[in-house]
Amino acid sequence: MSEAEARPTNFIRQIIDEDLASGKHTTVHTRFPPEPNGYLHIGHAKSICLNFGIAQDYQGQCNLRFDDTNPVKEDIEYVDSIKNDVEWLGFHWSGDIRYSSDYFDQLHAYAVELINKGLAYVDELTPEQIREYRGTLTAPGKNSPFRDRSVEENLALFEKMRTGGFEEGKACLRAKIDMASPFIVMRDPVLYRIKFAEHHQTGNKWCIYPMYDFTHCISDALEGITHSLCTLEFQDNRRLYDWVLDNITIPVHPRQYEFSRLNLEYTVMSKRKLNLLVTDKHVEGWDDPRMPTISGLRRRGYTAASIREFCKRIGVTKQDNTIEMASLESCIREDLNENAPRAMAVIDPVKLVIENYPQGESEMVTMPNHPNKPEMGSREVPFSGEIWIDRADFREEANKQYKRLVMGKEVRLRNAYVIKAERVEKDAEGNITTIFCTYDADTLSKDPADGRKVKGVIHWVSAAHALPIEIRLYDRLFSVPNPGAAEDFLSVINPESLVIKQGYGEPSLKAAVAGKAFQFEREGYFCLDSRYATADKLVFNRTVGLRDTWAKAGE
């Protein structure tokens, strides 16, 4: 990351500054603790940038810890993708990767300690009964008939759970707190449940697995985390976080702080809904460029710097809000406008023949790779008497606001000649198949000698040298700003979220590599697709347009 990415300030950093100034802490130690049961999305990027960014700015440490307490939903595939995403965003964890499963022996010992203190019991209510006994926000819960078992009985039953003596769902370990608490999370929460499933790290060693709320706080303490940062939905869970640490023998007691999660327009962040999009094949996978996943954004052409900048701009607060998609798009547009080399590609091609150009000949035209950065150099682009232009760049008749090619009028070809449209050929349906023009041979990259003004400029690709390319025009996945609020979020999928075109690109695009963007002049920002592109088939994804067409449509 560059020094230009200035250090932000927010309420969490103010707390850290106070903790360091008062001597409460002498160093800063954070962590990013994803569950490996799916791919990370842009919301996780906010947490990654916060936790790793704080550690970086305060010369502290940030752990990457996988909260792997549910073997049924987790997979090593997700572990690998999360590691890749964190590193791609420009961060690296302190020391080795941690797993909550590293602490299973200690977690079990702490559970036994709670039983010995009379603060945990084995419950044999069914999961449905536990929900029923828990009560509601307006009605207190009621005690389980198994709540007052003796310490000895609970120890024996917990050991029976550990050794596979109960079937799944037939017993669990619960904290003994207060079934009348105004906070439902404190109404004897489950600490351990039974799952006969092979774990990707521990194999079949365990058939009981700790719950998140029991695991999370102890893992933080064991790792010496100073500031445990969570999103706002875990605010009530802080009471349980503190209760567990207050009631076990552990020397460190981290403090949890909550910040607002990232909500983004025109997409969904729910793992369940994202999974439904994938499994029902509404998208091509977790890395589909329309998905809000980090892997999807990367494949679409977003840069790590643009995502970090986005997370910096939206800031860290305690108030939930929804961020406009235009804010994210603005970050990548600014990044690529500054850094992407230019190239020419025609997305909706129509043939244009220059009738007075020397037949069968061609020449090289010099073009800058970036109009404002001479240090990025230039390239030689072939020009000939037959070229492709975009169909939208020609009209037989047009008003004065139309600054492109019109029958009988002139336009400049980018970095080449001034041409004049003379006639067209059409097919049986009346569609234009060829535009015939003449050119002014004395206007190569300069104005006409007689002083006439030619205002319009269009891009082109020499037909004899053109590379056939597939162009995937990606757009917002949903047609409404808040698809999650729809009765059926699948019903508001944008039918135009992917339009595939067959076009032509200039020869320099043969050297394109996945992850490196171009500005296709006058069209937008594009990158080579990492899945479908091959040496024989160039496939480009539209990352973002040159301007926000959604804002214009909403005016």
Swiss-Prot record:
Database matches in Pfam families: tRNA-synt_1c, tRNA-synt_1c_C, tRNA-synt_1c_C2
Catalytic activity from the UniProt record: tRNA(Gln) + L-glutamine + ATP = L-glutaminyl-tRNA(Gln) + AMP + diphosphate
Gene Ontology cellular component list: cytosol
Positions with a binding annotation for ATP: 35-37, 41-47, 231, 261-262, 269-271
Cellular localization per UniProt: Cytoplasm
An MF annotation (GO) of this entry: glutamine-tRNA ligase activity
Key words, A-Z: Aminoacyl-tRNA synthetase, ATP-binding, Cytoplasm, Ligase, Nucleotide-binding, Protein biosynthesis
Gene3D superfamilies tied to this protein: Glutamyl-trna Synthetase, Domain 2, Glutamyl-tRNA Synthetase, Domain 3, HUPs, Ribosomal Protein L25, Chain P
Keyword Nucleotide-binding: yes
TM annotation in the entry: none
Location of the motif 'HIGH' region: 34-44
EC number of this enzyme: 6.1.1.18
Main location: cytoplasm
Motif ('KMSKS' region): 268-272
BP term (GO), one: glutamyl-tRNA aminoacylation
Region ranges (Interaction with tRNA): 317-324
Family: Belongs to the class-I aminoacyl-tRNA synthetase family.
NCBIfam families assigned to the protein according to its UniProt record, in alphabetical order: glnS (TIGR00440), PRK14703.1 (NF011291)
Record note on quaternary structure: Monomer.
The name this protein goes by in its record: Glutamine--tRNA ligase
Source organism of this protein record: Salmonella typhimurium (strain LT2 / SGSC1412 / ATCC 700720)
Gene responsible for this protein: glnS
